[in-house]
């Protein structure tokens, strides 16, 4: 170690330790990565290294220890790669230039139209020799001697700022801590495109320290003109032009305050750019705050990225971020970046600039920029992703968009349920609902077909792995499905928010979509359900056969509505939703609330008896109808919740009317009766924790309804087909019961999601696979043919686990046992 010479080189304001190996300064690649190029993606750096054919030197133990001694590498590092100073410079220049170029190239065409790139840019783009070897070296620190630029020396003079008319202009090179380095001013007006385009390749020109030269080139447009141009081109007048200079980086400007004080606003001094600018190249921070620099550098990302990006943290931040923005939102960002990323760029740029402002240090800036870039990307990508998920159908649903917006409005109108959900934008819940919710939402576009199909598919695929029985389950769990789809989808996100609210919103959205959608599809169903008011009506047998028990389910739905009626907010929303579902669905069909009545979900016994045999097919169809109905119901709920809270009462009245046919719980049972889950649980599923359950439902399928009973006080009810009276009993207490259950469920769901997921003893003694039949003989406890019992198979029944399309691999306990295997 004694013979190893080490030292420190400051590059672009970053202090790098080096070892002298074979007469060469060798820098730790890890430090170059983390400190010097920290705001540049590693992959980019590696690509540049490969492109530049950087030669790596692997440290031996002694060198490693020495590097640790000078804190160039982590003390726990087991190995280190060194690269020569030349390679560091080349890599730094390349990475910075490339980053700029990437973004700028796209803008170059536009920028070219504006101006030819200033020589400074050409120099920046020029081979690093021009940059590095020239007086203006980006590599400030590496060649400690390289720093002295006549300009930089001048820029250090307090009066220099006064001398520099363009002090307010962005400086390519921002001052390094403790000293001013020549900053090449990028004319605010100049689009980074200029830099990029053009003449970078053939026109590489070393920067002339002569300020006049730079100013003429860079500031060919006076800041005022530049400001106008900026405003015009980049919308950056605020951030790019002197004003930002005042706004954003007073922190930074404190260095420049004397300069700025001396420097008139660019608009005021058109001659500034013409004045000799010793600092043109070297304005340390003269008037460019990091913000400005970032704005400028953002546009002059080259310069900024070259030297100023690191030197002026804002520059690097905004330039890189905006570069990436530019890459991502090149055209938008050009304008927006020009405006400091007027919009997104503006946010991030502002944040970054602010952070940069706060931390003049380039490293702080760099981190900010990295994070900001990522955040920006995230934010940029996010809307697309959101839209991609939800809006892809949303566009399809744009026709139904009116409905969907209405749903959104409805969602907005849901004050009580949406209070917490309200904050979320419709798009948000579209996202939250994921595809399922998005599907209902988008289904309006497809309306009848899209929504049911997607939803059925989703429900089968998403809600329940078991597509066949799943459809039965789904059908029986329509409420849950609606919830699972509407709420379940949203549930993952909505779980924290009131899923019920989200669901209601979704439901409303879906409802709006669905009334059209399902009513379109289910108009017959609605009619049939209307016929199903008689619940037995087979006039709708076409769809009744499809949904033989839909009348029951319809009745259940009204009953369910009655249940929500008990729960004032939930009931109002649910009943209103149900009523609205009735109204909407019925409106779609016969515009009669009986639609929901007709939507009556198949009774457990029917479900149990028929669902598993012929009903499997019918069940799926029924389930689809019911699902549509349930979703209608949910959407109706949501919509009702919006507009029909009174209607909810109306719905209550209707549900009460319907309740006789099936109590709210009966309805919920109707919906989930096949699953044997009581309505309160359904309500909870819909309005409360059950929505969370819907998350599981989404994962597991509709099972949560079945599993609801174990968790719920309604367990017995859920397990056994709930008589109407029984349901009514809950209906009477449903408000309290649902609220209680919901609360319990929310609490227990939260807890159950955490602790109840696996209740060994609760799940262990699975129901016997063989039982003694009425004839005294052994009978399979479970079969697809358990029509003997009016009740659906026990929740532990394999049918719930091993349905067609279901996973043969048991679900994780958190999903498997939560209200499922009880």
Swiss-Prot record:
Q: InterPro entries annotated for this entry?
A: DNA-bd_dom_put_sf (IPR009061), ElonginBC-PRC2_ViralRestrict (IPR052119), EPOP (IPR027971), SKI/SNO/DAC (IPR003380), Ski_DNA-bd_sf (IPR037000)
Q: Which UniProt keywords apply?
A: Isopeptide bond, Ubl conjugation
Its source organism is: Mus musculus
Could you tell me where the Low complexity compositional bias lies?
Answer: 278-318
| Entry-linked CDD domains | DHD_SKIDA1
Looking up Pfam families in the UniProt record yields:
EPOP, Ski_Sno_DHD
Q: List the protein's name.
A: SKI/DACH domain-containing protein 1
Gene of origin?
A: Skida1
Compositional bias segments (type: Basic residues):
245-261
* Sequence ranges of Polar residues compositional bias: 660-675
Cross-link Glycyl lysine isopeptide (Lys-Gly) (interchain with G-Cter in SUMO2): where in chain: 602
| Compositional bias annotation for Acidic residues | 319-338
Q: Which family does it belong to?
A: Belongs to the DACH/dachshund family.
Matching entries from PANTHER family are given as:
FLJ44216 PROTEIN-RELATED (PTHR23187), SKI_DACH DOMAIN-CONTAINING PROTEIN 1 (PTHR23187:SF2)
Region Disordered: which residues? 245-370, 658-677, 706-732
